[in-house]
Amino acid sequence: MLINRNIVALFALPFMASATASELSIGAGAAYNESPYRGYNENTKAIPLISYEGDSFYVRQTTLGFILSQSEKNELSLTASWMPLEFDPADNDDYAMQQLDKRDSTAMAGVAWYHHERWGTVKASAAADVLDNSNGWVGELSVFHKMQIGRLSLTPALGVLYYDENFSDYYYGISESESRRSGLASYSAQDAWVPYVSLTAKYPIGEHVVLMASAGYSELPEEITDSPMIDRNESFTFVTGVSWRF
């Protein structure tokens, strides 16, 4: 099953934007993802929703951050995270795709910087694959802004992900041996920029319960869509859930 990286990003930014010091929230949700891989239909799966903001570290979904420096306007941290992007040929309906090798999710380590202004927050981050699955790295640059409308909070975000050549080729390339087995043309993916937009809504019910919903859209570049593994040029993700705020 393919799990789009936006599932991780959709809730992580709004948590960071709204959480106060030492705030913990735990919950569960469902994630719907339109996979760009051929042979996949829409995917829906249950996911945990976890957020903690402390003085020296934080948990924002699948990212653990250790704060190196923090001020009113800036935060710099070391990060350890889980990259959920994966491809399992056993879950695919297309015979040719079933002949390809599995692409595993992986652990990432890197650095993240947040800069806060009245008009919003800028995030810049970079992280490398520490399990050597792809031997690649991923960067992100985004801006988001929380808007309060009564009890409802809305957080639109605009950003771009950067996949280096090794990362792109691991998840979207086709080797010569895979080509011979599957009949698909071999393909070497290049580094790629993936723009995305998202909107997250949060609505508290009482003192502790918070309802959440978020939608994200990614436009895939030709470095990815030219791969025979891919049959669409966009990816859509929707996540909804409920959490308990301590």
From Swiss-Prot:
It holds the Pfam family MipA. It is found in: Cell outer membrane. Residues 1-21 form the signal peptide. It is a peripheral membrane protein. Keywords: Cell outer membrane, Membrane, Signal. It comes from the Bacteria. Its main location: membrane. GO terms for cellular component: cell outer membrane. One of its GO terms (biological process) is peptidoglycan biosynthetic process. PANTHER family: MLTA-INTERACTING PROTEIN-RELATED. Belongs to the MipA/OmpV family. This is Putative outer membrane protein YiaT. It comes from Escherichia coli O157:H7.
